[in-house]
Amino acid sequence: MVSCGPRKFSTPEDVQEVLELAGPNRPALDSVISHYRDEGNVFKEEAAYFLIGNMKKHGYAVYHLVDSTGEEVDFNVLSYPDYEALLDGWDELENRRGGLRFEVDTFYHDYHIVTAKYMIENIDLAYEAWNRFKWAGHLDFEEFCEYVLPYRSSNEPVESWRRYFYDKLSWVADSVKDPSDPTEAAIWVNNYIKSWFRFDPRYYEHPTDQGLSEMLDKKLGRCEDMTNLAIYAMRALAIPVMSDFTPYWANTGNNHAWNAILDRNDSVVIFMGGEANPGEYQLGHKLAKVYRKTFSIQENSLPEKLEPWEKAPPYLNSNTIRDVTADYVDAVRVKVDLNKGIPDSVNFAYLCVFNSGEWKAIDYTRFHGEKAYFSQVGPGVAYLHAFYYDEKIVPGGDAFILTDSARVDYLIPDGSNRINIQLYSTTRRITKETTDFSEEASFTPGAIYILYYWRDKWEEAGRAVAGKGPLHFSNVPSGALYWLVQEGSRKEERIFTLNSEGHQVWW
């Protein structure tokens, strides 16, 4: 991370490195530094060093969708009336053209494209807002650099949003009752965003986060777009706002990003841009791991530790995120055994949660011998520790439950002690109770359901056709982690264990 304090020495090495990478665009970046040196403003010069020095890994990609032959496929998320229709349309495309995937067409490094005019305007306006608005008075220079100054929030196209919102929302300063309260200012801004922008799940299939111009045009987006929009509007007024995210929920499918504000007491208060204000927002599912997006390069991030030949799983492959799990849950440290064999040339073990039909990595550690220690993880979750080899998750041990008391309970199928079980649901959310408090089955009559148990992979334990009552399975290995899936589903069903009474316990 490039220092964000008073500088007494020559141009930092990381800045020099980026200037060399900039190639033909180096004169633009050099002129930003020269501009503030000539102006004699040490703080703005330091701000320029912060942005340029941390620019190395920032940029955005333009994608295109291709089929199994590599031929480009025309696809627009807004061509479908709703998310279910989009998923059906995607399935229909894959049936006709084979597997679909987004491929990078062009990647634009920030150090190749940002102009001196853009950088200077961004720094000047950020600095002006920091000094103008009383609600930013509690920020030190390092907090200003991280939570106000950056010209981008994630991997979206670079656009001039700061001037737009600085002018558009100038009325907020006259509307707040307490001009020293950044949270009140954030509420005014968020109410403005809520008046015209909406969440739309179709944007789950949009290949990138949107830039401001696209959001102003469509007025729709996914959670990452909503957090970015709030960051644009609020940072333009020097309201210190950030984006936190969980790579994958621990007890349901998908992931999530949301906003947080650094209030005047230096406490972090969460909210959802365009949806729920600070003090009103609650996360809807279980957290195993939480990270905060940063502009500054995090030296302890996974990409900074990997050897050149090593790959990182999705979401952990960023060096501009930092772990803030302990801010959200009573995080614990867990030790696990690596007893499934260790692939060659692998230096890290990963902790995975089960999400949308797959084990997905949410944390990492450098292992020692046949032991691995993961720090700061959420309890009350089913985990699998694994390796990332050939860009695939490879089990490193048995799945386990990390209990609320931080005990590790391994889930090892016992084929010598087989049981008969009856099941009422594929997920916790659709389990019903009748008026006499007896459990009611919730299946699609006539549909085939497959019961799996985990033993280094999902092994089939039996099939059943749904009627009106529960599903019955016999001769099932006991003590395992189970997964009941409707044939042909999108694999959003949840995993479970069985308690001493044979009832499903959901994870």
Where are the regions that the model predicts?
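Sec-dependent bacterial lipoprotein signal peptides
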Residues: M1-V2
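N-terminal accessory/pre-domain segments preceding catalytic cores
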Residues: G5-A186, A236, N265, A288-W507
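Sec/Tat-exported extracytoplasmic proteins
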Residues: N25, I193-F197, D263
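A structural motif
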Residues: E159-Y164, F197-Y203
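Hydrophobic/aromatic-rich core segments of domains that either
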Residues: S175-Y192, Y203-S213, K219-P313
